[in-house]
Amino acid sequence: MKKNEKANISASYNDLIATICNPRISDVGTYRIESVVGEGSFGKVYLAAHLLTNTKVVLKSSCRKQAIILAREIHHHRRLLHPNITRLYEVVCTEDRIYLAMEYCPNGELYDWVAREKRLDEKTTCRIMWQLCCAIQYLHRQGCVHRDLKLENIFLDKAYNVKLGDFGFSRDSDCSRRTFMNTRCGTVAYCAPELVQGHKYIGECVDIWSLGIIMYALLIGRLPFDEDDVSLTEQKIINECPQYPETLSKNSSSLLKSLLCKDYRLRPSIDQIISHPYFKENGYHSSSIRDPRPSSKAEEKVRKRLEFVGVDMDQLNASISQQRCDMFYGWWLLLLEKEMRKENKKKKGLFHLHKGSSSAVHIAPATPSLKTAQVSVMSNNQDSLKSRHTSSDSSNSLLSTFRSWLFDPKQKHTADTLSSSAIRPRTPSPSAENYLTQENFDSDNLSESLDNSVENLTVFPSINSFGRRHSNLPQTTHVDTGEQNTPFTPPLLKTVNLDGNKDFTFPSNSQNSPSKSSNLSINIDIPPSPLQNTVISPQPTRRSRTPIRSLSGRSSVASSRNSSRTRSYSNVSSASSNSLISIISSKPSSSTVQRQTPFHSPFERLHKSFHFPSGEPFNTRINATAIFTVGSGRKNPQSSSSLMFNQSSVKEEEEPEETSFSDSSKHFTDLL
């Protein structure tokens, strides 16, 4: 017995040494690194997951020597909250590295999509350009210009929605003041003529020109000005006009010509672009643009959940108001995004949950005031067994419990749950543990079923038989097969217990019962009344997305990567940016006295015994210094402004004369 104990101690000791000596990074702050998705001279780009919300993010790693360069990007990026702009969640500083946790876009760059497709149809191009114009309009109204718009800096999320990124060249600009700039930056093939000539330029006009280059590449499949020789490319930008194929529609050709006008004074403003007939004929109107700010209801829900798990609300409020990009601010944004997705799905009226080969349950709210919940009805016994087996895994028990606290504050959690070595699956309600332990875990659907208790279950048929509702019967369940309307009592029933008191039953093996592969449309109402009106429709409702065809050929857009380009940056004018530079450029103290790790009392009850799938313990104390800085307040410029400028009324703002162009690095721009 003693020999076995010594052997276990020795093995544990060796594992500890191997973990400490392993040069590979496994965790950065509250993020678990999964893989490397990019690499350049600035550092590596990792795919990671937030440990407490299980949300995938991108970690951009940079050296501390580039703190001044990163300060500009962080300063502008952290205050941009728009559905078509990549989100900056958190900035984690270690002894020698700086990590930026940003939104993950699984479908990569728009450049790669255009290279595969060669060119896009006008309908798809219109949708992409509309989303991109909405992002640019928001950016300009925030008093900021991008100055490096290109296909490589536009990313696509899971649904192929546009996400604008890479704000390394961004600069404060006020449309009402009509500020001139003189720093040469960006990518040559996307640069405006006045910038290439070395003249002073207006940042908004440069962004409009770049929009025209992007639209040209989407419709035609190549860049209008792109040569291997940089000087030849510049000469074409200044002297030549792009060729417009006759296949283009009248409105698209009209918009392209206005965007690629050589005279910046004749280019339209972003508000005029959004009102162009090209978008109106495709069903996009400026009146349909919604306020990107999250609703107060979603914010209140997230605050209550964070307060429930013990977060210091004073510190959280300070992080939000000052946009510190620390651990609390990142946690807040991740949960707020989940809540916003939940509200958007509620507005559509249908929820979809797919679990392998089991029957999916679609829940349609009867009225907006009624609560809704999400239930998974599994007709496959193997799926059920796998789910139970996974939920009993002791390595995930405490993390699952914490997530259920976070997403379901109304759920009662006893002290037995903490002390148990495994979380037992509970059937009375669809809690967070059951969703977390399923094989095909969908974090977007997790929060759909939270904060809801189910008392009354009403099943509605699909659209074809929506008007066929039965009268209220207290004891008999009716099944609508589309052919008959008679009471049906099957001998074999499956039971889904929703609240511990009332069961919903339907036939498991019957000729009149729906097949195992069909989807059921269910509406769950929660008034204080008994079980009523059960109608089952066997008609499947499945979502499908046509995959993008893969082409072996490659567009001439790829040639833009061959030219050599460099970058330069002007001084950061904002006071908050100067403070930011001093923070992230300062090195940790080299004093002999060991600096005590800051401890946050809100996590006292959680930080000792977290365990994850790999078996490695996790301490929720902050293990990396985050940036704390106060963003200076600024007034938003006038929203209605035209870039038809008068030279005599323009105020010039001097910048140090520098010449720099960016290279077309993959996923994130290579900082030189």
From Swiss-Prot:
Active site: D148 (proton acceptor)
Domain Protein kinase residues, every copy: 31-279
Reactions catalysed, as given in the entry: L-seryl-[protein] + ATP = O-phospho-L-seryl-[protein] + ADP + H(+); L-threonyl-[protein] + ATP = O-phospho-L-threonyl-[protein] + ADP + H(+)
GO cellular component, one term: cytoplasm
Localization per Swiss-Prot or TrEMBL: Cytoplasm
Alphabetical list of PROSITE patterns matching this protein: PROTEIN_KINASE_ATP (PS00107), PROTEIN_KINASE_DOM (PS50011), PROTEIN_KINASE_ST (PS00108)
Keywords: ATP-binding, Cytoplasm, Kinase, Meiosis, Nucleotide-binding, Phosphoprotein, Serine/threonine-protein kinase, Transferase
EC number(s) given by UniProt: 2.7.11.1
CDD domains in the record: STKc_AMPK-like
Binding site for ATP: V37, G38, E39, G40, S41, F42, G43, K44, V45, K60
Region (Disordered), start-end ranges: 375-396, 416-436, 464-572, 632-672
Main location: cytoplasm
Signal peptide feature range: none
UniProt cross-references to SMART domains, sorted A to Z: S_TKc
Phosphoserine carried by residues: S231
Gene Ontology BP, a term: signaling
Compositionally biased spans, kind Low complexity: 508-523, 549-572, 639-649
GO molecular function, one term: protein serine/threonine kinase activity
InterPro entries (alphabetical): Aur-like, Kinase-like_dom_sf, Prot_kinase_dom, Protein_kinase_ATP_BS, Ser/Thr_kinase_AS
Pfam families, per the entry: Pkinase
Extent of Polar residues compositional bias: 375-384, 472-487, 531-541
Gene3D superfamilies, per database record: Transferase(Phosphotransferase) domain 1 (1.10.510.10)
Function noted in UniProt: Has a role in meiosis.
Family: Belongs to the protein kinase superfamily. Ser/Thr protein kinase family.
Protein name from the UniProt record: Serine/threonine-protein kinase ppk16
